């Protein structure tokens, strides 16, 4: 790809930029290092980490597409170089509240100090994504001690837990907030979009069939 000036990426991102105001690139870590697997291997177990030409790629992207807006999906266990690459180009990363809130696996103990999600300005905040439980489902799955701590943390806000987290997200310092429809409607896990690592029903089957509740929620959001 580097030999032809990253034509694949320039064409792909350039076309997407005609359709969308902002483009999220998943698995951003692969622009730092990627897992190379021999074509003869039946699984992905055998392979090696290869350093990617991330800086050369993004230099080319911004030279040819200077007005493009990109979000870097920077979740998971990352080496520092991934974040350095992200920050070099001032790309907003992702913050998901469900990952920011500390959970006690056994439900015991109390927080030693008030919790605060690390939502910084140059990031995009989510209550959850398509791969998460809905906020209502996630809260229901927490142990009592964690539920109590979350309730204390969200005390300044009103409504369902999902509505409270939405208010927190909208009032944070982030550049963008992305809210799943299921959280806007305070739906439980029966409306979950996807369970990573699984196939078949009910993944990707949920549909919004009635806009009336959503329209009511939009009016409420305007007051927040």
Residue ranges and their predicted role:
Residues 216-224:
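C-terminal accessory segments of extracellular proteins
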């Amino acid at each position: 790809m580097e030999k032809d000036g990253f034509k694949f990426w320039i064409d792909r991102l350039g076309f997407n930029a005609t359709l969308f105001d902002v483009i999220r690139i998943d698995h951003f870590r692969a622009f730092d290092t990627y897992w190379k697997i021999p074509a003869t291997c039946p699984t992905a177990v055998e392979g090696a980490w290869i350093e990617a030409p991330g800086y050369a790629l993004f230099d080319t992207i911004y030279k040819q597409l200077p007005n493009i807006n990109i979000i870097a999906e920077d979740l998971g266990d990352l080496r520092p170089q991934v974040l350095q690459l992200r920050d070099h180009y001032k790309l907003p990363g992702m913050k998901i509240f469900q990952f920011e809130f500390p959970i006690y696996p056994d439900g015991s103990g109390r927080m030693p100090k008030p919790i605060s999600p690390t939502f910084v300005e140059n990031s995009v905040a989510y209550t959850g994504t398509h791969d998460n439980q809905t906020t209502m489902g996630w809260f229901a799955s927490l142990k009592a001690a964690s539920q109590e701590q979350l309730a204390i943390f969200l005390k300044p806000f009103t409504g369902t837990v999902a509505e409270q987290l939405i208010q927190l997200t909208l009032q944070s310092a982030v550049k963008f907030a992305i809210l799943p429809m299921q959280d806007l409607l305070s739906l439980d896990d029966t409306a979950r979009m996807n369970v990573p690592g699984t196939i078949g029903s009910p993944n990707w089957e949920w549909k919004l069939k009635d806009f009336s509740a959503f329209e009511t929620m939009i009016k409420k959001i305007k007051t927040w």
